[in-house]
Every structure is written in C-alpha cells, then in structure tokens.
C-alpha cells in the first residue's frame, strides 16, 4: 500500500517514498516557503525544553566521545 500525505504548505497529495525528493512537501517551492516561515519565526516550538538533569563537563565529554565513535562521518576540528 502506498502512503499518501498532504503537503504541509499547499495540501497537494504527496506519495511518501524514497523517490519523493521533497517529502513531505510536494515541491522545492513549498519546502522553501516552509523554511522561510521557520526563519521568520512564524513557526516555533511552543514549549520550553524541560531539563531534569544538569550535565557535568565530564558527562558532556563522554557523550561527545560516544557520538563521534558512532558517527564516523564527523571529523573533529584540529
């Protein structure tokens, strides 16, 4: 079964598949309109992020090291 979703900008039907280059948008135009709306802060995340735990420098360093080990496409700055 093929999944079809409405374009968030114009509501045109978009087939959700790997070959749909601009998904969930129907076109580059709709994708850029949406990006512009985010840049102008017409769209925003409505709630502040709640942080339950304060991370120490050591914890942040360990998380960064683990991330870099698992994501080989990132290069550490020299």
From Swiss-Prot:
GO terms for molecular function: DNA topoisomerase type II (double strand cut, ATP-hydrolyzing) inhibitor activity; zinc ion binding. SUPFAM superfamilies: Glucocorticoid receptor-like (DNA-binding domain). InterPro entries: DNA_gyrase_inhibitor_YacG (IPR005584), Znf_NHR/GATA (IPR013088). Its cofactor is Zn(2+). Zn(2+) binds at residues 7, 10, 26, 30. One of its GO terms (biological process) is regulation of DNA-templated transcription. Binds 1 zinc ion. Keywords: Metal-binding, Zinc. Inhibits all the catalytic activities of DNA gyrase by preventing its interaction with DNA. Acts by binding directly to the C-terminal domain of GyrB, which probably disrupts DNA binding by the gyrase. Interacts with GyrB. Belongs to the DNA gyrase inhibitor YacG family. NCBIfam families: PRK00418.1 (NF001638). HAMAP family: DNA_gyrase_inhibitor_YacG. This is DNA gyrase inhibitor YacG. It comes from Colwellia psychrerythraea (strain 34H / ATCC BAA-681) (Vibrio psychroerythus). The lineage of its organism: Bacteria, Pseudomonadati, Pseudomonadota, Gammaproteobacteria, Alteromonadales. The gene is yacG.
